[in-house]
């Protein structure tokens, strides 16, 4: 009898030993932030959350963080998400407070029909977005893991549209938006950076520069990127290398500049470069193909690195537009065109024709193997092209006008 009792006790102990770690793992994997407060902000519902750190993030010490979820003015199922990274001079609360006044860090102001997620990196020392000070190199750092996990949690918790998640930031937050956003094209549809404080973060995260992308690293097609920086802002130094890298990689970049300093007031910036809000970055969807325009004939000369006192404003790819028509297993089709003067109020001279290379990104259904041949047509023009080592197809030297013209790409049988 005693032997039976000892065996039964041993079984119980063994079960508990297995259950405890399993329970701990389940709790860690679940990671449920605590809703600390419900309130109202500018006529919109506001939820305040607090949470600890997941072990997988890799923080050296335990820490607590806060994030805010701002609801749209009208409840909406499957709404898009606007994600905001604050500057070095703000924290999550003061960042949101800027949205009470037009002209105060306008990039922080979430559209009324969007949910918005405001994240914090001020509470814990060395946890800043740009990562280059503490987490150098291409590896995914703890802050980035926290941001991405929080975004995914909010999308799921609130039932949002995972294909319409947009990342933006000002200054240090702009640097973080580039550095975190470009590496996560599987999360963010598009990124917009207002006077990003440096491009070192994004350059290291994306292997821009002399070091090639390692063979064991796969980079998802990145978000469409909008960047507006000033040549008379010391934080913009190095942009020539960033712009070149984006062009060489055939990534989508809409770039604007002018002597507006380290500004955050759109009204003042628009007086210097009235194109900075001309591209509808919030219309990009993660589950739709897009064209990356490179080597465009209409690009302005860069002020970086040695014409920083130049008073001229300029742009890269500012006038290109597209409309998706078809994305099927046998072909992908989209209309390419230039913005018309009737649709774009600007002091810039709007070109009537441009020549550019066009690379198709985020193609959903047409599968092209690396090195495989495809046939293409663009109006009366036609030809063949081969996919690069990542399976990306580029058609070089297309002449694009204000008249929408269909680019069609098919696999070669």
Give the residues covered by each predicted segment.
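Primarily recognizes the serine-hydrolase "nucleophile elbow" in alpha/beta-hydrolase
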Residues: 162-218
């Amino acid at each position: 009898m005693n032997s039976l009792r000892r065996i039964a006790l041993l079984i119980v102990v063994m079960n508990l030993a297995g259950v405890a770690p399993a329970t701990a793992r389940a709790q860690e994997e679940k990671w449920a932030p605590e809703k600390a407060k419900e309130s109202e902000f500018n006529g919109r519902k506001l939820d305040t959350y607090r949470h600890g750190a997941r072990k997988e993030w890799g923080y050296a010490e335990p820490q607590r963080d806060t994030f805010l979820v701002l609801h749209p003015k009208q409840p909406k199922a499957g709404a898009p998400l606007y994600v905001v990274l604050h500057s070095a001079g703000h924290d999550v609360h003061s960042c949101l407070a800027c949205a009470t006044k037009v002209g105060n860090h306008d990039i922080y102001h979430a559209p009324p029909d969007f949910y918005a997620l405001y994240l914090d990196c001020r509470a814990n020392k060395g946890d800043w977005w740009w990562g280059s000070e503490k987490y150098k190199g291409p590896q995914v750092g703890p802050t980035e893991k926290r941001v991405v996990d929080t975004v995914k949690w909010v999308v799921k918790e609130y039932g949002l549209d995972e294909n319409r998640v947009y990342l933006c930031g000002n200054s240090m937050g702009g640097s973080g938006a580039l550095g975190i956003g470009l590496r996560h094209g599987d999360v963010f549809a598009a990124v917009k950076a207002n006077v990003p404080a440096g491009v070192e973060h994004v350059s290291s995260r994306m292997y821009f520069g002399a070091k090639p992308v390692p063979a064991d690293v796969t980079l998802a097609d990145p978000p469409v990127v909008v960047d507006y920086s000033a040549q008379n802002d010391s934080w913009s130094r190095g942009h020539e290398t960033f712009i070149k890298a984006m062009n060489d990689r055939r990534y989508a970049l809409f770039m604007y500049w002018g002597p507006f300093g380290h500004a955050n007031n759109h009204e003042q910036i628009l007086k210097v470069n009235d194109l900075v809000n001309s591209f509808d970055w919030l219309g990009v969807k993660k589950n739709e193909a897009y064209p990356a325009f490179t080597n465009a004939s209409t690009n302005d000369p860069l002020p970086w690195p040695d014409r920083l006192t130049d008073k001229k404003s300029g742009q890269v790819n500012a006038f290109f537009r597209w409309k998706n028509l078809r994305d099927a297993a046998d072909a992908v089709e989209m209309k390419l065109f230039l913005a018309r003067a009737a649709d774009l109020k600007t002091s810039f001279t709007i070109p009537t024709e441009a020549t550019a290379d066009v690379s198709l990104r985020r193609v959903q259904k047409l599968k092209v193997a690396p090195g495989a041949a495809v046939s293409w047509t663009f109006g009366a023009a036609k030809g063949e092209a081969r996919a690069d080592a990542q399976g990306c197809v580029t058609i070089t030297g297309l002449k694009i006008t204000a008249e929408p013209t269909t680019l069609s790409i098919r696999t070669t049988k």
